[in-house]
């Protein structure tokens, strides 16, 4: 967790988040990032070449993104989860036809500064979508077949798209993430068995 105090008697404010940052966690992330940059630098024969610069740039960009996400209210992710998931599906479709191809796989979108891999973001996108979906429906509807159609599509669509890149490892992680969230939502095991046999 990014903050020292695990709970507040009121919702987190920006001030609360700033003054309760877990400095140990922040330092650990920065230290690992610096070590990885020096490891890349060393593997390049002591030359700060394209790969070293690219790695350093990605670390800085995603560390800033990490901070932005941490300071963003949870209500924002709750209200935009469906939209985020939809955009990620569009990006996966884009990758399938127009993505950057390397070593037999087509997984990346060229953003000129960096190559973005939507399948990695989809791991989070599936969790956001399903969490919000199950939050919106009543507990009694969780095990009804008609309410399970959306989660099944939301899990299988990105799974199939990522598998076709091909990227088996990421596809399996997306599938497992979806199954775990669905199980935590209260879906019975016999329904999992039914869909597995189907």
What are these regions (language model features)?
Residues 1, 17-19, 164:
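Intrinsic disorder/low-complexity signature
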